[in-house]
Amino acid sequence: MFLKSLHLRHFRNYSEQSVTFAAPKTILVGDNAQGKSNLLEAVEWLATLQSHRTHRDRDLIQQGHESAQIEATLERQGVPLDLAVSLRPSSGRVLRVNGCTVKRTADFLGQLNAVEFSCLDLELVRGTPAIRRNWLDRILLQLEPLYSQLLQTYQKALRQRNALLKQAGSQGWDEALWQAWNQQLVINGTRIIRRRQRLIERLAPLAQDWHRVLSGDRETLTLSYESHVPLGDGTSEAIVAAFSEALATRRAIEFLQKTSLVGPHRDDVGFCLNAQSARQFASQGQQRTLVLALKLAELALVESVVGDTPLLLLDDVLAELDLQRQGILLEVMGDRYQTLMTTTHLAPFAAPWRQQAQILKVTAGTIASVSDTAAQTSD
Ligand SMILES: Nc1ncnc2c1ncn2[C@@H]1O[C@H](COP(=O)(O)OP(=O)(O)OP(=O)(O)O)[C@@H](O)[C@H]1O
């Protein structure tokens, strides 16, 4: 898969900007707060219809404007493909594939695949469970576009159920409606749990292998999906039964706390190094190694499932890695994956590597092509 060009209009700090990608590797260099991450965010948005930096479309639109557009031309297995999105909070999103408007997000997702690795991902180990759930969900959205509908249906059931819990204790309690939302929560929640659990099972051996390489065979990484619902033998029937039972058991406490306490919206992912919780014991260096192993696993999994090489988006991460890990990452990338990476300095990139890359200078929402020497001089 190759992203040939990108056009941004009123997206973040870009007023109107076209970029043509001319090499498998593109380095976006510039000072802080110039728009480097914003450009990667636009590509991430085309891949997942989400940003890991914000949940609100409004934030993506340039201040003082009503709408933003992202347009991309790519080549997928030799076939050209045009993608376009228009974000307008007042009237919603418009998604187009090859000039035709698509109604379902599932028809847009999966057209462009990308694996993003940013310094925010370093939070995957120590951050909140929501960060790890979002990570799984973003991968699933690319592997299985219909997952977006499943998430939406689940979130709707959760919102309705929480609204009912807020009314609990008042007159006119509607038990039938409560049971109906419980059923929706259990059916869709079970589907989500099973998909996430299967994803972990597929990522685990890949991440384990990478981790072994990165840690010089010193540590063994294990991944587990930590659900509030006992998974039993992992079948739908077993999870549905356990989920229903957990809801019945926790009914009193949910009524007291007025919120839903059981379901995939509360689940987590566990990482262990040599059987010890990475969240509690991993050093900064071990966390970086672990996250790099996860990202390399993600890259391999997306590639094997979609049958094409995803784009790799590296947002300011090379500086976070030591020379050995940088070397491994750059070697894996080779020319196999089209890679867009941001940096404030070109120094960490070896000279031969820089010479092969397209270097773009980002300054206050404008992008200019520069030679290696020119970028170095102004660096
Ligand atoms: N909706 C918006 N409208 C206008 N400007 C915005 C909007 N959202 C973000 N910005 C601006 O974009 C800039 C941040 O860009 P970005 O996050 O891409 O930085 P960066 O170049 O990657 O820098 P760093 O190296 O610090 O990560 C800031 O100046 C911010 O004010």
Curated annotation (Swiss-Prot):
Localization per Swiss-Prot or TrEMBL: Cytoplasm
Which keywords does this Swiss-Prot/TrEMBL entry list?
A: ATP-binding, Cytoplasm, DNA damage, DNA repair, DNA replication, DNA-binding, Nucleotide-binding, SOS response
Do you know which Pfam families this protein is assigned to?
SMC_N
User: What sections of the protein cross the membrane?
Assistant: none
| GO annotation, cellular component aspect | cytoplasm
Q: Which GO terms describe its biological process?
A: DNA replication; DNA synthesis involved in DNA repair; double-strand break repair; SOS response
The residues that the entry says bind ATP are: 30-37
This entry's Gene Ontology molecular function terms read: ATP binding; single-stranded DNA binding
Q: Which residues form the signal peptide?
A: none
Family stated for the protein in its record: Belongs to the RecF family.
So what does this one do? The RecF protein is involved in DNA metabolism; it is required for DNA replication and normal SOS inducibility. RecF binds preferentially to single-stranded, linear DNA. It also seems to bind ATP.
UniProt-recorded name of the protein = DNA replication and repair protein RecF
Q: Which organism is it from?
A: Thermosynechococcus vestitus (strain NIES-2133 / IAM M-273 / BP-1)
| Gene symbol of the encoding locus | recF
